[in-house]
C-alpha cells in the first residue's frame, strides 16, 4: 500500500497521508483550509513498514482504506506550570 506524505506549512509537526500523490479529492475542504498548502515529503510503502513514526501503522492503513486520507497531529503539549502547581498543592481546581 503506497501513500504520499505531506507536511503542513501552517501547523507544526502535522502530516497528511493520502492514497495518491497530489490527490486531495477525498480530504474535506475545512481540513485542507486548516492544514494549508501541503508540502510533499515522501512516498512510502506501508506494506513494507513495521513502524511509522508516532502514528499507529494499522490506524493509518485503516483510515486510508476507509476515508482516503489520514491526518497525523502532534500530541498535546504538557502544561508544565499546571503540573508543577498540582505537585506542590497550589492548584485550587
Swiss-Prot record:
The organism's place on the tree of life at top rank: Bacteria
SUPFAM superfamilies per record: YcgL-like
Domain YcgL: 1-85
Pfam families hit by this protein: YcgL (PF05166)
PROSITE patterns found in the cross-reference section: YCGL
InterPro entries: YcgL-like_sf, YcgL_dom
HAMAP family membership: UPF0745
Full protein name: YcgL domain-containing protein PSHAb0508
Amino acid at each position: 500500500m503506497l501513500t504520499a506524505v505531506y507536511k503542513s506549512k501552517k501547523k507544526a509537526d502535522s502530516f497528511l497521508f493520502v492514497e495518491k500523490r497530489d490527490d486531495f479529492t477525498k480530504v474535506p475542504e475545512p481540513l485542507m483550509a486548516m492544514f494549508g498548502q501541503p508540502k510533499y515529503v515522501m512516498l512510502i510503502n506501508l506494506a513494507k513498514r513495521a513502524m511509522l513514526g508516532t502514528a499507529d501503522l494499522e490506524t493509518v492503513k485503516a483510515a486510508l482504506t476507509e476515508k482516503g486520507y489520514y491526518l497525523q497531529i502532534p500530541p498535546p503539549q504538557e502544561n508544565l506550570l499546571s503540573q508543577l502547581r498540582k505537585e506542590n498543592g497550589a492548584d485550587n481546581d
